[in-house]
């Protein structure tokens, strides 16, 4: 039996300024989840690069839960970013959003790649 994927939603906000503030809050939450994940990775692999993997089933579960939390935080941030890209017409803001996309998506991809590598080596 498979379960339907969790539907990710963000609060509705009116206006660009509240959405920009919300984007910053979502990015802060993403960064906190990234810090938690990095801390958990150091417990499972002291080198934090997949070369010295060791942990028990409980730690493996924690790593998998960290991945879900990071993905959820990234998806919420991404939903808000897409809203702003559609609604905001300020060229300075649009450039800023594109720079944030490049930075945050790279952090997300790098973290997920390392975590998946660890889980495969441990599993």
Give the residues covered by each predicted segment.
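Extended alpha-helical scaffold segments
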Residues: 1-123
């Amino acid at each position: 039996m498979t379960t339907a994927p969790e539907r990710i939603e963000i609060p509705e906000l009116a206006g660009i300024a509240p959405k920009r503030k919300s984007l910053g809050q979502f990015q802060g939450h993403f960064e906190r989840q990234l810090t938690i994940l990095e801390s958990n990775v150091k417990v499972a692999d002291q080198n934090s690069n997949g070369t010295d993997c060791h942990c028990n089933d409980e730690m493996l579960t924690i790593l998998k839960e960290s991945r879900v939390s990071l993905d959820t935080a990234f998806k919420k941030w991404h939903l808000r970013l897409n809203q702003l890209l559609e609604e905001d017409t300020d060229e300075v803001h649009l450039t800023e959003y594109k720079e944030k996309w490049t930075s945050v998506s790279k952090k997300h991809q790098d973290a997920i790649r390392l975590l998946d590598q660890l889980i495969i080596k441990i599993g």
